Amino acid sequence: MIPGEYKVKPGYIELNIGRATCSIIVENHGDRPIQVGSHYHFAEVNPALKFDRQKARGYRLNIAAGTAVRFEPGQKREVELVALSGARIVHGFRGDIMGELEANDE
């Protein structure tokens, strides 16, 4: 084996199979690039990103763990989101939820 070498099986790696997903259009209205990580609660991202935040509640980007999506100023793109799993308790981020998602859905 060569140091740093990867040995992977042929084919595709499927992520989040069977999980609820949705697609939304996101536009960066800011004057700086905005990068969003794979496990960030998407409804709470930077306010300069304009999209349907209610639709994004309880979802994150449907991308591989540890990766991110970058939105350049003025850029508009469609992204796929995947439902958060587990206990669906959200703390931190921008502080909009701070607890159970379903308890805050009023």
Swiss-Prot record:
Enzyme Commission number(s): 3.5.1.5
What is the annotated signal peptide range for this record? none
| Catalytic reaction(s) noted | urea + 2 H2O + H(+) = hydrogencarbonate + 2 NH4(+)
GO MF terms, alphabetically ordered: urease activity
What enzyme class is recorded for this protein? hydrolase
Q: Keywords assigned by UniProt?
A: Cytoplasm, Hydrolase
State any GO CC term.
urease complex
Cell compartments where the protein resides: Cytoplasm
Gene3D superfamilies (UniProt xref): Urease, beta subunit
Can you supply a Gene Ontology BP term from the record? Answer: urea catabolic process
Record has Cytoplasm as a keyword: yes
Q: In which pathway does it act?
A: Nitrogen metabolism; urea degradation; CO(2) and NH(3) from urea (urease route): step 1/1
Indicate yes or no for the key word Hydrolase: yes
Q: How does it assemble?
A: Heterotrimer of UreA (gamma), UreB (beta) and UreC (alpha) subunits. Three heterotrimers associate to form the active enzyme.
Family statement: Belongs to the urease beta subunit family.
- Put simply, this protein is called Urease subunit beta
Say which species the protein is native to.
Escherichia coli O157:H7
